[in-house]
Curated annotation (Swiss-Prot):
GO biological process: microtubule-based process; protein folding; tubulin complex assembly
Record-stated family: Belongs to the prefoldin subunit alpha family.
Assembly description: Heterohexamer of two PFD-alpha type and four PFD-beta type subunits.
Protein name: Probable prefoldin subunit 3
Functional summary from the UniProt entry: Binds specifically to cytosolic chaperonin (c-CPN) and transfers target proteins to it. Binds to nascent polypeptide chain and promotes folding in an environment in which there are many competing pathways for nonnative proteins.
Gene: pfdn3
Species name: Dictyostelium discoideum
Taxonomy, superkingdom: Eukaryota
PANTHER family hit by this protein: PREFOLDIN SUBUNIT 3
Entry-linked InterPro entries: PFD3 (IPR016655), Prefoldin (IPR009053), Prefoldin_subunit_alpha (IPR004127)
Keyword presence, Chaperone: yes
Keywords: Chaperone
GO molecular function: tubulin binding
GO CC terms, sorted: cytoplasm; prefoldin complex
Length: 195
């Protein structure tokens, strides 16, 4: 457990040694609010909690977008694997295909007894592969994408837990502040006199 230092009394909010694979820090649950806010300005604590909340919401958005992109990429790679299998099954015959030239623009082609297949590698690079080599390249890419997808899903779950913990911390500090202000009001002292 992290300890409060005199140099930065707000640093305890994060357990710096506990992070995910993507280096997202874990927020500390404030179990003893009175001890945590002692000798600190409550407004600064709120500010720090809000900053942490915004950072986690940013991570959540980034990870959600990443998951969406990786899911789409995984589907595309699976479709490519299915196409390689389909073309290989028709390697002893001629057939017609429609292919996409660019987004929304298609063309037809006649394929005569294919013995290999071409894969787009990106950056306007296309290479010819045997069916087995193409399958190997696509499977390797799909495995990498699926692993990244799994890690992103785990990180998103972690971030959602941190958002929940931060929300609870904000509520606990807010409630503590309200109780302290009520006590001051009942005692007849002002906040300035209490300090």
């Amino acid at each position: 457990m992290a300890t409060i230092t005199n140099a930065d009394p707000y640093k305890i909010l994060f357990e710096q040694d506990i992070k995910t694979a993507t280096n997202i820090p874990m927020v500390t649950f404030i179990s003893n609010v009175e001890e945590f806010v002692k000798d600190k300005d409550v407004e600064n604590v709120f500010k720090q909690l809000q900053e942490a909340y915004q950072k986690y919401k940013f991570f959540e958005s980034k990870l959600s977008n990443n998951i969406s992109m990786l899911t789409q990429r995984s589907k595309q790679l699976q479709e490519s694997l299915d196409i390689v299998d389909h073309v290989e099954n028709k390697s002893n015959e001629s057939f017609s295909v429609q292919y996409e030239l660019s987004e929304g623009v298609y063309s037809s082609a006649q394929v005569n007894e294919p013995k290999s297949i071409y894969l787009w590698l990106g950056a306007n690079v296309m290479l010819e592969y045997s069916f087995e080599e193409a399958r190997e390249v696509l499977r390797k890419n799909k495995d990498t994408v699926d692993r990244q997808l799994s890690e992103s899903i785990q990180d998103l779950g972690f971030v959602k837990d941190q958002i929940t913990t931060t929300d609870v911390n904000v509520s606990r500090v807010y409630n503590y502040d309200i109780i302290q202000k009520r006590k001051l009001k009942l005692s007849g002292k002002t906040e300035e006199e209490e300090k």
